[in-house]
Amino acid sequence: AQMSHQYYVTDEIPELAAREFPLPLLRDPDTSYYLRQERNSYILGPYEWQATAMWRDGIPDHFANMLWSEDLERLETQILDASERVPVLGEAGIARVVNGPIPYAPDGNPYMGPERGLRNFWHCNTFSFGIAQGGGAGKAIAEWVLEGRPEFDIWNIDRRRYKDYATTQYTIDKAVEVYQNEYA
């Protein structure tokens, strides 16, 4: 399922520009957001509890880097909490808001492997944590394609772990649940 995921980037913050080293990533599992430095700005990326699944009938044919309208009201709790924790965040203006698709499998894990009935068609998607799993996934999919199987047991990310029970509605319902509890 494709979830609507928003984050915003602040205007430049002089205190960040004055630092020699970037600040570490901050994740708040209770309020469900991440905050990280992006050059001389912050990125605040919540996993809001009012999760919204998009494209229930599949990705549109015309999709190409498409974004949706911002909906900062959905992020109000996380914005207020993060601004209290890091006061300079609340003082900074917002340079831009990004509201785009982030794919989720029903269990929150990647979805990889050969497609049944389609020769040389491979899935390698639903990496909800961005590049964090990229190296291992790249190694596994390359071994799978070139050698017939990955070096390690990767059943927990193999697309074949889902059977007939995984209908479109099931997939959407579980993806929403996983997204809402990303840091739970």
Say what each PLM segment does.
Residues 19-21, 55-56:
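Short, charged, solvent-exposed linker or helix-capping segments at domain edges/interfaces
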Residues 1-18, 77:
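Central beta-strand plus flanking loop segment that forms part of the substrate or channel wall
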Residues 1, 30, 39, 53-54, ...:
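C-terminal catalytic lobe of FAD-dependent flavoproteins
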Residues 33, 37-48, 55:
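Beta-propeller blade termini and top-face loops
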Residues 10-14, 20-38:
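Phosphate/diphosphate-binding loops
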Residues 11, 36, 45, 113, ...:
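Residue-level detector of conserved, well-ordered beta-strand and adjacent loop positions
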Residues 4, 48, 98:
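Residues at the C-termini of beta-strands that transition into short coil/loop
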